[in-house]
């Protein structure tokens, strides 16, 4: 919205700054951060009054989780409000890619909110029906994939870009939209599975998002794209503003989610943020790189898949408990120890993912 102030510029004054993505990204970051700081406590107090008993704790979970009883959930609302306000104020609203990612984020947030609401009202860990969640998420992801394919340059529409290889594309044809559904749904649910300890999910999400802000800026700039040998996707640089707002809102949330958490993100936040990462990967044509940058989420999701399949086949478990962060809890690792080590892993994987920009 504030980008339109450039119409008041004569080319050398303050209003000219609004032309620059980096300036507006900084504005979006601080807007979202301050929103999170100032409105975090009032939101937590409101959630505590409305939810009374807070998020239900599983009886079969790690014993130390029983001390978290009464902690309110749906804290993802704080991140979502902050990033939405930051994006609407500072991003170019005539950019279709921004709207795709923002609407995917809010769509998955709505699914998560309904799920959290069901859990809180029934005081049971089983919320919204899995089939309903899957169906709505599939529709949102399919619409996003189709919109991205329509907006992409003709030479890239329906194509899958391969990292490490210059100008390597695989034409997916009619399989492109189903593939984008897999990416977006997979990312949303993987982040959702990771959100099981105080502060565990939000930092890796911000790290992955920061990595994709660099990717979006590079592939959206013809000079950088040509230098790095990546595919040029005009307009994606504007997603750096969205990501900056996400990180600002995420930090504001982490202020209250740091151990011991005063509020949980809930499915409201985890599904939304995962969906956002998936949508950004699709828009920037770096879907495979997301599996590297977000490798921590992949491992968490795979641990659940392996556990379920192995148990159905043998009646035994591979892990003491899945997702894998609970396995380490059962082995005696402290919560802070697990969280910080997973943050370190997320940072290392993000750096490896960014290296794919040049290694080709």
UniProtKB/Swiss-Prot annotation:
One Gene Ontology molecular-function label: metal ion binding
Membrane topology: Multi-pass membrane protein
Pathway it works in: Cell wall biogenesis; peptidoglycan biosynthesis
InterPro entries: Glycosyl_transferase_4, PNAcMuramoyl-5peptid_Trfase, PNAcMuramoyl-5peptid_Trfase_CS
Compartment list: Cell inner membrane
Catalysed reaction, written as an equation: UDP-N-acetyl-alpha-D-muramoyl-L-alanyl-gamma-D-glutamyl-meso-2,6-diaminopimeloyl-D-alanyl-D-alanine + di-trans,octa-cis-undecaprenyl phosphate = di-trans,octa-cis-undecaprenyl diphospho-N-acetyl-alpha-D-muramoyl-L-alanyl-D-glutamyl-meso-2,6-diaminopimeloyl-D-alanyl-D-alanine + UMP
Main location: membrane
Record GO biological process: cell division; cell wall organization; peptidoglycan biosynthetic process; regulation of cell shape
Regions crossing the membrane: 20-40, 71-91, 93-113, 134-154, 168-188, 199-219, 239-259, 263-283, 288-308, 337-357
Keyword Cell cycle appears in the UniProt entry: yes
Domain of life: Bacteria
Top-level enzyme category: transferase
EC code: 2.7.8.13
One Gene Ontology term, aspect cellular component: plasma membrane
UniProt keyword terms in alphabetical order: Cell cycle, Cell division, Cell inner membrane, Cell membrane, Cell shape, Cell wall biogenesis/degradation, Magnesium, Membrane, Metal-binding, Peptidoglycan synthesis, Transferase, Transmembrane, Transmembrane helix
Swiss-Prot/TrEMBL cofactor(s): Mg(2+)
Family: Belongs to the glycosyltransferase 4 family. MraY subfamily.
Function summary: Catalyzes the initial step of the lipid cycle reactions in the biosynthesis of the cell wall peptidoglycan: transfers peptidoglycan precursor phospho-MurNAc-pentapeptide from UDP-MurNAc-pentapeptide onto the lipid carrier undecaprenyl phosphate, yielding undecaprenyl-pyrophosphoryl-MurNAc-pentapeptide, known as lipid I.
Protein name, per record: Phospho-N-acetylmuramoyl-pentapeptide-transferase
């Amino acid at each position: 919205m504030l980008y339109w102030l450039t119409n008041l510029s004569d080319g050398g004054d303050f209003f000219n700054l609004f032309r620059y993505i980096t300036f507006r990204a900084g504005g979006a970051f601080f807007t979202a951060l301050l929103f999170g700081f100032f409105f975090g406590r009032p939101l937590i107090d409101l959630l505590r009054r409305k939810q009374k008993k807070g998020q239900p704790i599983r009886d079969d979970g790690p014993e130390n989780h029983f001390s978290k009883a009464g902690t309110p959930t749906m804290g993802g609302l704080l991140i979502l409000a902050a990033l939405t306000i930051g994006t609407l104020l500072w991003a170019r609203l005539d950019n279709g890619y921004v709207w795709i990612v923002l609407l995917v984020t809010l769509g998955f947030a709505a699914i998560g909110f309904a799920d959290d609401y069901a859990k809180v009202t029934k005081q049971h860990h089983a919320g919204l029906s899995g089939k309903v969640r899957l169906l709505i998420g599939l529709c949102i992801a399919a619409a996003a994939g189709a919109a991205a394919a329509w907006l992409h340059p003709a030479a890239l529409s329906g194509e899958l870009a391969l990292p490490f290889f210059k100008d390597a594309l695989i034409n997916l044809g009619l399989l492109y939209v189903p593939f984008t559904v897999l990416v977006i749904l997979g990312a949303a649910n993987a982040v959702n599975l990771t959100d099981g300890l105080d502060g565990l999910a939000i930092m890796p999400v911000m790290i992955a998002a920061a990595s994709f802000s660099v990717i979006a800026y590079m592939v959206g700039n013809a000079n950088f794209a040509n230098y790095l040998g990546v595919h040029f996707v005009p307009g994606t640089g504007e997603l750096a503003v969205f990501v900056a707002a996400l990180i600002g809102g995420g930090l504001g949330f982490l202020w209250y989610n740091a151990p011991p958490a005063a509020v949980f993100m809930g499915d409201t936040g985890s599904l939304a943020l995962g969906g956002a990462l998936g949508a950004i990967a699709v828009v920037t044509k770096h879907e495979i790189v997301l599996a590297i940058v977000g490798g921590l989420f992949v491992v968490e999701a795979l641990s659940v898949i392996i556990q379920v399949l192995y148990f159905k086949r043998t009646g035994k478990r591979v892990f003491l408990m899945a997702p894998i962060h609970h396995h380490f809890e059962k082995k005696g690792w402290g919560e802070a120890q697990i969280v910080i080590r997973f943050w370190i892993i997320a940072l290392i994987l993000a750096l490896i993912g960014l290296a794919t920009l040049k290694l080709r």
